[in-house]
Amino acid sequence: MRPSGRTAQQIRPVTITRNFTKHAEGSVLIEFGETKVLCNASVERGVPRFLKGKGQGWVTAEYSMLPRATHTRSAREASRGKQGGRTLEIQRLIGRSLRTCIDMSALGEHTITIDCDVIQADGGTRTASITGACVALVDALNWMRAQGMVKVNPLKEMVAAISVGILDGEPVSDLEYIEDSKADTDMNIVMTEAGKFIEIQGTAEGEAFSFDEMNSLVEMARHSIRELIDIQKQALA
């Protein structure tokens, strides 16, 4: 039995609140159970130097956790003068995931930056960030269309992500922190609406996992991501 009483395949209750803040072109609060992430999408004219004159846009992301998002306070990375390796890894993952779903030529020479700020962490912050950021990105693109900044919708398809793992010998989906800290295997999987993979991150924390167990986790993730994309679309309807 999982601590929450959920079945192995069951994800936590997911809530997506759009237009959460006033100023951002796309703003979403996403909640996976007790994990809460604010995803703000900001639109700017112009692109990084390496893209200037190419007629393409750019989508990038930044990720951070508020000092008291966890059980004990963590110092702000700004106070240490640099970002940690985990932060850099996660924000690169978010950026890669979002760029996959955008036609950069249709975006034109505009940059969209997604800021993912973890308000409260209870496992799965990077996957919640990707899932919420995609909805914020869609709202930002719709704003651009309304402003006449793009002629056609640059969105190719939705993207979502989920964590899966092996807990007490059983594959489970959408791990809470207490589960993640005890899991023998932990995976983060990002997929497109069409069912294609963007990223599979898998690590054996305790006991090594078999090929069959890996396939079980991937199949479980596919099912959960289909469910998440349905939730995204309902929020955008």
Swiss-Prot record:
Q: Upper taxonomic classification of the species?
A: Bacteria, Pseudomonadati, Pseudomonadota, Gammaproteobacteria, Alteromonadales
User: Which protein is depicted?
Assistant: Ribonuclease PH
What is the protein's quaternary organization?
A: Homohexameric ring arranged as a trimer of dimers.
Which InterPro entries does the record match to this protein? ExoRNase_PH_dom1, ExoRNase_PH_dom2, ExoRNase_PH_dom2_sf, PNPase/RNase_PH_dom_sf, Ribosomal_Su5_D2-typ_SF, RNase_PH, RNase_PH_bac-type, RNase_PH_CS
- Reaction(s) catalysed by this chain's protein: tRNA(n+1) + phosphate = tRNA(n) + a ribonucleoside 5'-diphosphate
Species name:
Idiomarina loihiensis (strain ATCC BAA-735 / DSM 15497 / L2-TR)
Pfam families on file: RNase_PH, RNase_PH_C
Question: What general EC class does the enzyme of this chain belong to?
Answer: transferase
One biological process GO term for this chain? tRNA processing
Q: Does the keyword Nucleotidyltransferase apply?
A: yes
